[in-house]
Regions:
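Acidic, glycine-rich A-domain
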Residues: 1-173
Length: 173
Protein backbone atom coordinates (compact mmCIF):
# COMPACT_ATOMS: atom_id res chain seq x y z
CA UNK A 1 0.00 0.00 0.00
CA UNK A 2 2.63 2.53 1.04
CA UNK A 3 5.15 1.58 -1.68
CA UNK A 4 2.61 2.17 -4.43
CA UNK A 5 1.94 5.67 -3.13
CA UNK A 6 5.58 6.73 -2.94
CA UNK A 7 6.61 9.36 -5.48
CA UNK A 8 9.55 9.72 -7.85
CA UNK A 9 12.62 7.60 -7.14
CA UNK A 10 10.81 5.86 -4.24
CA UNK A 11 7.71 4.79 -6.23
CA UNK A 12 6.96 1.08 -5.69
CA UNK A 13 9.92 0.65 -3.34
CA UNK A 14 9.68 -1.03 0.04
CA UNK A 15 12.53 -1.68 2.43
CA UNK A 16 13.53 -4.95 4.01
CA UNK A 17 14.63 -4.51 7.58
CA UNK A 18 17.76 -6.30 8.55
CA UNK A 19 21.33 -5.64 9.57
CA UNK A 20 21.73 -4.47 5.95
CA UNK A 21 18.37 -3.10 4.82
CA UNK A 22 17.65 -3.03 1.10
CA UNK A 23 15.12 -1.32 -1.12
CA UNK A 24 13.12 -3.77 -3.23
CA UNK A 25 10.86 -2.80 -6.12
CA UNK A 26 7.34 -4.10 -5.59
CA UNK A 27 6.20 -6.49 -8.33
CA UNK A 28 2.89 -8.15 -9.10
CA UNK A 29 -0.41 -7.25 -10.71
CA UNK A 30 -2.81 -8.48 -8.04
CA UNK A 31 -2.76 -8.10 -4.27
CA UNK A 32 -2.04 -11.84 -3.99
CA UNK A 33 0.97 -11.60 -6.31
CA UNK A 34 2.28 -8.58 -4.39
CA UNK A 35 1.93 -10.29 -1.01
CA UNK A 36 3.72 -13.39 -2.30
CA UNK A 37 6.49 -11.21 -3.74
CA UNK A 38 6.92 -9.29 -0.47
CA UNK A 39 7.01 -12.51 1.56
CA UNK A 40 9.94 -13.77 -0.55
CA UNK A 41 12.05 -10.67 0.19
CA UNK A 42 15.16 -11.01 2.35
CA UNK A 43 13.74 -10.41 5.82
CA UNK A 44 16.50 -11.14 8.32
CA UNK A 45 14.33 -10.40 11.36
CA UNK A 46 16.60 -7.79 12.87
CA UNK A 47 16.78 -4.05 12.37
CA UNK A 48 19.47 -1.44 11.93
CA UNK A 49 17.31 1.66 11.79
CA UNK A 50 20.29 3.94 11.24
CA UNK A 51 21.23 2.07 8.06
CA UNK A 52 17.59 2.15 6.92
CA UNK A 53 17.39 5.92 7.28
CA UNK A 54 20.74 6.39 5.56
CA UNK A 55 19.56 4.12 2.71
CA UNK A 56 16.65 6.51 2.13
CA UNK A 57 19.14 9.38 2.02
CA UNK A 58 21.37 7.48 -0.44
CA UNK A 59 18.46 7.16 -2.90
CA UNK A 60 17.75 10.90 -2.58
CA UNK A 61 21.37 11.83 -3.24
CA UNK A 62 21.77 9.38 -6.16
CA UNK A 63 18.56 10.62 -7.82
CA UNK A 64 18.97 14.33 -6.97
CA UNK A 65 15.58 14.30 -5.25
CA UNK A 66 14.03 17.48 -3.93
CA UNK A 67 12.71 17.58 -0.36
CA UNK A 68 9.20 17.31 -1.79
CA UNK A 69 10.10 13.97 -3.42
CA UNK A 70 11.42 12.53 -0.16
CA UNK A 71 9.29 10.09 1.84
CA UNK A 72 7.49 11.97 4.60
CA UNK A 73 7.58 8.96 6.93
CA UNK A 74 9.44 5.72 7.50
CA UNK A 75 6.73 3.40 8.80
CA UNK A 76 8.12 0.37 10.60
CA UNK A 77 5.38 -2.25 10.76
CA UNK A 78 6.76 -4.68 13.29
CA UNK A 79 6.22 -7.07 16.16
CA UNK A 80 8.58 -4.72 18.06
CA UNK A 81 11.22 -7.38 18.46
CA UNK A 82 13.80 -4.88 17.26
CA UNK A 83 17.20 -5.76 18.61
CA UNK A 84 18.75 -2.29 18.35
CA UNK A 85 18.54 0.76 16.15
CA UNK A 86 22.17 1.01 15.08
CA UNK A 87 25.32 -1.01 14.70
CA UNK A 88 27.49 2.10 14.99
CA UNK A 89 29.02 3.77 18.01
CA UNK A 90 28.40 7.52 17.90
CA UNK A 91 28.95 10.07 20.61
CA UNK A 92 25.41 11.27 20.00
CA UNK A 93 22.05 9.55 19.84
CA UNK A 94 21.73 7.73 16.51
CA UNK A 95 18.60 9.71 15.58
CA UNK A 96 20.38 13.01 16.21
CA UNK A 97 23.36 11.77 14.20
CA UNK A 98 21.21 10.72 11.22
CA UNK A 99 19.24 14.00 11.41
CA UNK A 100 22.52 15.89 11.19
CA UNK A 101 23.67 13.83 8.17
CA UNK A 102 20.37 14.58 6.42
CA UNK A 103 20.76 18.30 7.16
CA UNK A 104 24.33 18.26 5.82
CA UNK A 105 22.86 17.09 2.49
CA UNK A 106 20.03 19.63 2.54
CA UNK A 107 17.24 17.28 3.60
CA UNK A 108 14.92 16.85 6.55
CA UNK A 109 14.89 13.38 8.12
CA UNK A 110 11.62 11.47 7.52
CA UNK A 111 9.15 11.06 10.33
CA UNK A 112 9.69 7.65 11.98
CA UNK A 113 6.69 5.57 13.01
CA UNK A 114 7.00 2.43 15.09
CA UNK A 115 3.76 0.54 14.37
CA UNK A 116 3.43 -2.33 16.82
CA UNK A 117 1.12 -4.90 15.20
CA UNK A 118 1.72 -7.51 17.89
CA UNK A 119 0.15 -6.61 21.20
CA UNK A 120 2.26 -9.06 23.19
CA UNK A 121 4.97 -6.38 23.46
CA UNK A 122 4.68 -2.92 24.96
CA UNK A 123 8.21 -1.91 24.00
CA UNK A 124 8.66 1.34 22.09
CA UNK A 125 11.95 2.71 20.88
CA UNK A 126 11.55 6.42 21.53
CA UNK A 127 10.74 8.70 24.40
CA UNK A 128 7.54 10.70 24.68
CA UNK A 129 9.13 13.99 23.63
CA UNK A 130 10.95 12.87 20.45
CA UNK A 131 9.51 15.06 17.68
CA UNK A 132 9.12 13.22 14.40
CA UNK A 133 8.72 9.79 16.00
CA UNK A 134 5.30 8.27 16.64
CA UNK A 135 4.38 5.14 18.52
CA UNK A 136 1.23 3.27 17.52
CA UNK A 137 -0.19 -0.12 18.31
CA UNK A 138 -3.05 -2.10 16.82
CA UNK A 139 -4.39 -3.23 13.49
CA UNK A 140 -7.54 -1.18 12.96
CA UNK A 141 -8.46 1.31 10.25
CA UNK A 142 -8.61 4.06 12.88
CA UNK A 143 -5.00 3.32 13.88
CA UNK A 144 -4.00 3.75 10.24
CA UNK A 145 -6.00 6.99 9.90
CA UNK A 146 -4.50 8.46 13.08
CA UNK A 147 -1.01 7.46 11.99
CA UNK A 148 -1.26 9.20 8.62
CA UNK A 149 -2.60 12.39 10.22
CA UNK A 150 0.12 12.84 12.82
CA UNK A 151 3.34 13.27 10.87
CA UNK A 152 6.03 15.31 12.64
CA UNK A 153 4.47 15.24 16.10
CA UNK A 154 5.83 13.87 19.36
CA UNK A 155 4.23 10.71 20.76
CA UNK A 156 2.43 12.83 23.38
CA UNK A 157 1.15 15.31 20.77
CA UNK A 158 -0.16 12.40 18.70
CA UNK A 159 -1.89 10.90 21.75
CA UNK A 160 -3.61 14.21 22.53
CA UNK A 161 -4.67 14.63 18.91
CA UNK A 162 -6.30 11.19 18.96
CA UNK A 163 -7.94 11.70 22.36
CA UNK A 164 -9.27 15.12 21.31
CA UNK A 165 -10.69 13.78 18.04
CA UNK A 166 -14.41 13.61 17.32
CA UNK A 167 -14.38 9.87 18.02
CA UNK A 168 -13.76 10.45 21.74
CA UNK A 169 -15.88 13.60 22.24
CA UNK A 170 -18.78 11.56 23.65
CA UNK A 171 -16.69 10.38 26.60
CA UNK A 172 -17.45 12.44 29.70
CA UNK A 173 -15.51 12.25 32.95
Amino acid sequence: YFAERNKGAYHNLFMTFSGNPQFVELKGNTITEKIKFISRANWQMNTDLEKALLKILDVAIENHCSQEEMPKSLIIISDMEIDRCTSQNHRENFYDYVSRVYEEHGYKIPNVVFWNVNSRHDVFLADKNRKGVQLVSGQSASTFKNLIGCVDKTPVEMMYEVLNSERYQAIQI
